[in-house]
Structures are given as C-alpha cells and as structure tokens.
C-alpha cells in the first residue's frame, strides 16, 4: 500500500520516489506470496494445485500495469490509477486478520528429523502413506513449534536445497533478462512506435494468462504426486514428483532462448506464449518444490532465502544488458542457453538421489 502511494506521488520534480515505491511494492508482493503459499499445507490432496493457483494470481499481476497503461492512454492519470490501486490493498488486511491461520498451518504434532547422510528426512504430508526413515536418526525429533537455527542450517546445506537455489537463480536470470530487454527487441524488429506499443499490449494480455497456466502447472504436479505416492522411500514421495516439472521448465527456457535467437517479427507471438508458460511453471515450481520437499515450519525461511539469493544473483542482468549493447544480443542468448543447460543438473541429481533412496529401502526389505 505504501509503495503504491509513493508511486502515485512521483513527479518529474521528485523522480527518485519511484525507487522506494517500487522496492516497497516488490517487498510487499514477495511477503504476501511467501505467506499465502503455505496455505497449500492445509490441503491433504491438491496442495500442488493450490500453489499453482496462488502463483498464477501472483504471475498475472502484470495485468494491473496493463490497466494503468490503458487508463493513461484514455486520459486517466497515473496518480489516480495508483491511488485506486493503493486503496484496494485494504483487502489484504481483511484476508490476513480474518481468514489466514494465526500460526503454522500444519498441526504441531507433525515431526521432522535430520539425518546424517541425507541431511533431511522429509516429513510425511497428510494423505500420503507413512514411510520408513532413510538413515539412522542422528538428531532429536523436533516439532513445528520448536524451530531451531541448527536444523535450518542443515537443511540449507543439503543438495536437495542448494541445487534448487542454483536452478532458481539461473532460470530467473533468463526470465529477468527477456523482460528487461523486450522493449529493445520490439523496437529492433518492428517498424514504428505504434507497433511497439500494440505488441507491448499483446504481451501483457498474454502474460495475464498466467492465472490459467499456473493452476495447470499445479495440476500437472498433482498428477505426478499421485503417480509416485506409493514409492517405497519417503524421500522419493516428496521429491520425485517435482522432477518432471523442473525438467519441463528448463526445456521451455531453451525453447524461448532459441526463438529469441531467430530475431523474426513473425515469431513474436510464439515468444509471448512460451514466455507465459515458462514464467508460470517456473514460479509455481519455485514455491511448490520447497512446500513438498521440506518441513512446513521452515517453508517461509527457505522461500525467503531463495528469493533473496536469486534476487542478488539476478543483478547480473545489468552486465548482460551491457554485453548485449556493446556486442551482440545473440551472444547473450547463447550464454543463457548454456546456463539453462547447467540448471538441468538439479532434476537429474534429484532423480539419482531418489533412485538410491528406493534401492536402500529395497535392500532393507
């Protein structure tokens, strides 16, 4: 709300207000999604779809800026639009104080354990079959209301988490670069400013499709959860359903990069469609993976650490913009294809870890 008010009062005489305004809007948005995504734990079945719906609503927020742009073209000032937007933020207070749970959304009886070799023993989610522990337990059992720093550090140091942070950083850099350079791409490939404005509107309309694409991504994740719910290993039941979606997201990033290499105006619509698919599945998996693979008591902390780390990493986009301006945008896109290829290590590693966990369970039997 404060960010929207500050942007509303930004003028040519006070241009610097845009920076604290946008920073506050970004901070508020991230805080909201970090909180609301944990609601998926309230649903024994369909948690992945819930994450998809919430991510879709977050993803389609670009439509708000489209409304501001269209309103400005019709004579509605930016100040008026942002004052109206700020007033609608009162609804978040209603949701926070009347509807959201006041504590962790998981029952406090749920327990997790930290192991020595596979440092995280995934807790059983409601609705899933109970499973055996992967290794001998080396730390005390802890309930959700006894969160401690040492356990959080152990979770952060696991390949299950570190590789996900790497995956998020690399794919988000790809996303931020295209969003930051799309206007330059349109100006280069189109003939006049009116066409650039028209295609910008089309892109924003297409991006609003995230509210449909993200729930579909969540439904696809739910399908994978049902396929692997009878896995012998509890680790596999929590991690394996994510592998297909993680791989699909990386593949979409490669396709998007190849389309950008072609530099053909006739491909712009394809770029917009693949962009909304890529962004929707990406943001769904950023959150859904952590929700499924880690204890609910740590979800907020882990999503927050992931968000901050990837945000700092994505400052590299400015170096990519400079590289593109001084040399060639094709070189940057080829470089990003290589980075996306590296991101495939994440689903591949998790697949190997799941196979090993299942083999150990088979050996015990």
Predicted features, each with a name:
Residues 15-32, 267-281:
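Hydrophobic core of transmembrane alpha-helices in multi-pass small-molecule transporters
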Residues 29-52, 186, 281-294:
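Intracellular juxtamembrane helix-capping segments at the cytosolic ends
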Residues 32, 44-76, 80-84, 88-92, ...:
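Glycine-rich segments within core transmembrane alpha-helices of 12-TM secondary carriers
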Residues 80-98, 332-350:
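Symmetry-related core transmembrane helices of the 12-TM Major Facilitator Superfamily/SLC fold
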Residues 100-162, 166, 177, 181, ...:
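Long, low-complexity inter-transmembrane loops of multi-pass membrane transporters
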Residues 152-217, 283, 287:
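Extracytoplasmic gate region of multi-pass secondary transporters
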Residues 199-231, 249-252, 313-317:
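Transmembrane alpha-helices of Major Facilitator/SLC transporters
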Residues 231-286:
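C-terminal transmembrane helical hairpin of 12-TM major facilitator-type secondary transporters
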């Amino acid at each position: 709300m404060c960010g929207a008010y500050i942007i509303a009062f930004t003028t040519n005489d006070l241009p610097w207000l845009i920076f604290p305004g946008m920073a506050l809007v970004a901070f508020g948005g991230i805080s909201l999604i970090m909180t609301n995504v944990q609601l998926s734990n309230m649903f024994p079945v369909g948690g992945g779809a819930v994450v998809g719906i919430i991510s879709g609503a977050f993803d389609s927020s670009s439509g708000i800026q489209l409304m501001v742009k269209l309103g400005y073209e019709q004579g509605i000032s930016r100040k008026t639009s942002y004052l109206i937007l700020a007033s609608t933020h009162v609804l978040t207070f209603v949701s926070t104080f009347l509807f959201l749970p006041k504590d962790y959304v998981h029952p406090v009886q749920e327990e997790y354990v930290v192991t020595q070799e596979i440092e995280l023993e995934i807790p059983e989610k409601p609705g899933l079959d109970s499973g055996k522990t992967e290794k001998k337990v080396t730390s005390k059992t802890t309930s959700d209301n006894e969160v401690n720093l040492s356990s959080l550090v152990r979770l952060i140091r696991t390949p299950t988490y570190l590789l996900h942070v790497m995956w998020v950083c690399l794919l988000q850099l790809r996303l931020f670069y295209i969003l930051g350079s799309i206007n330059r791409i349109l100006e280069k490939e189109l003939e006049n400013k009116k066409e650039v404005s028209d295609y910008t509107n089309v892109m924003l309309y297409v991006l609003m499709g995230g509210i449909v694409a993200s729930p579909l991504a969540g439904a696809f994740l739910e399908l994978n959860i049902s396929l692997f719910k009878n896995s012998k290993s509890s680790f596999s039941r929590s991690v394996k359903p994510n592998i297909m979606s993680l791989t699909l997201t990386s593949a979409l990033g490669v396709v998007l990069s190849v389309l950008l290499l072609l530099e053909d105006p006739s491909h712009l619509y394809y770029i917009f469609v693949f962009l909304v698919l890529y962004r929707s599945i990406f943001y769904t998996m950023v959150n859904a993976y952590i929700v499924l693979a880690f204890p609910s008591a740590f979800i907020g902390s882990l999503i927050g650490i992931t968000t901050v780390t990837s945000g700092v990493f994505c400052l590299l986009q400015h170096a990519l913009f400079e590289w593109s301006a001084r040399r060639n945008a094709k070189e940057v896109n080829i470089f990003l294809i290589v980075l996306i290829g590296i991101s495939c290590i994440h689903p591949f590693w998790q697949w190997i870890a799941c196979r090993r966990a299942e083999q150990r369970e088979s050996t015990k039997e």
